[in-house]
Amino acid sequence: MEEENVTSSPSTPVHRLRHRRRSNEVVTDGDKVNASPLLVNDRNKYKSFMVRTYSTLWMIGGFVLVVYMGHLYITAMVVVIQIFMAKELFNLLRKAPEDKCLPYIKQLNWHFFFTAMLFVYGRILSQRLANTMTADQFFYRLVSGLIKYHMAICYLLYIIGFMWFILTLKKKMYKYQFGQYAWTHMILIVVFTQSSFTVANIFEGIFWFLLPASLIIINDIFAYIFGFFFGRTPLIKLSPKKTWEGFIGASVTTIISAFVLANILGRFPWLTCPRQDLSTGWLQCDADPLFKPEPFALPAWIPEWFPWKEMTILPVQWHALCLGLFASIIAPFGGFFASGFKRAFKIKDFGDSIPGHGGITDRMDCQMVMAVFAYIYLQSFIVSQSVSVDKILDQILTNLTFEEQQALFVKLGQMLKDKLS
């Protein structure tokens, strides 16, 4: 009986000895795998890695195909992405019981969405639409009239939506309805701010859309690869899966890729020429000085055994380094912001439309930040802000009627004649 009491007592030396023995047992291989901090040693994570890889390859293939088709098709792709993003974000705060009592709330959201789309794209593409229609006098006058009253039409559509919202207010539902109204407008600001800059970059030359977008894709892929195989040190609490190894490895890869990729893409006129209309034909133009090769002498600290003392580069490659730095260091904070947002709403992903990636919005968080920076950098440091013949002609074609253009032509001809006489 004494032995039984000793054995059953948790405070006896025998029990403590047995406890220590259990803690010193040999760990099985399976336990070692699960205890490893590297994601590559986790079977579930490895399966997720393969699914994510297949999805990424399909997305890259589709992206390359659309880029090959040209400016107008890339813009159409941006519009489709916007619609999917808006759908995911609209659904985020919807509640089924309340929506059943408000049958028109979804239609109202989409009314505001398409009104905002008409306003944004009308302002961006109006001049190019007018340039496309100059050959047909009837369509040119029709388009000119629509452009002239574009803002009034958009405002009228918005007021219709505003009145529609007021008329659908229901007792005991006010807070939910006004919350949806505010949420809808926030979505429109986020989605269309990014897209307006993206489309503007596309028509300045596909290069200015393709390079920034590709750098974000490269950074995202290599952050995942370096983190998957080497990641041990957590980077930020908002995203526990992000590691310093992934962040640093992706940053170095992205900056190098920016310099190399700019040299490759900058040699194709089809990618570098700006598009002034909405046609789909191939482009040819005189190369901008940014895309003309120049000799570059390598620094003196390069070892003597290195075979090249001079190399040919494009001036745009130096600008590409700035884009690469931003894509690798600043743009990921768009992803961190999205992670914090998802934690606030206690969701894993914005959607499930892309296997292994989540929703469309999950892929666009860093792209939104990058598109805005690329546009601001392009307009501030690269594109000339001086008045040009093309810009004046665009203003004339957009803002003057056919009769006013004829009058301007006569007056301009008379002025030139007087100067020459």
From Swiss-Prot:
Which UniProt keywords are given for this protein, alphabetically ordered? Acetylation, Lipid biosynthesis, Lipid metabolism, Magnesium, Membrane, Nucleotidyltransferase, Phospholipid biosynthesis, Phospholipid metabolism, Transferase, Transmembrane, Transmembrane helix
What note does UniProt attach to the cofactor annotation?
A: Requires a divalent cation for activity.
* Pathway info: Phospholipid metabolism; CDP-diacylglycerol biosynthesis; CDP-diacylglycerol from sn-glycerol 3-phosphate: step 3/3
Q: What is its main location?
A: membrane
According to its UniProt record, which cofactors does this protein need?
Mg(2+)
Instruction: Name the chain's protein.
Output: Phosphatidate cytidylyltransferase 1
Which gene is transcribed and translated to give this protein?
Answer: CDS1
- Point out the signal peptide segment: none
Under the heading PANTHER family, the entry gives:
PHOSPHATIDATE CYTIDYLYLTRANSFERASE, PHOSPHATIDATE CYTIDYLYLTRANSFERASE 1
| Family note | Belongs to the CDS family.
From the Swiss-Prot or TrEMBL record, what is one GO molecular function term? phosphatidate cytidylyltransferase activity
Q: InterPro entries, per this entry?
A: PC_trans (IPR000374), PC_Trfase_euk (IPR016720)
UniProt organism field: Arabidopsis thaliana (Mouse-ear cress)
Where do the TM regions start and end?
A: 60-80, 102-122, 149-169, 183-203, 206-226, 246-266, 321-341, 369-389
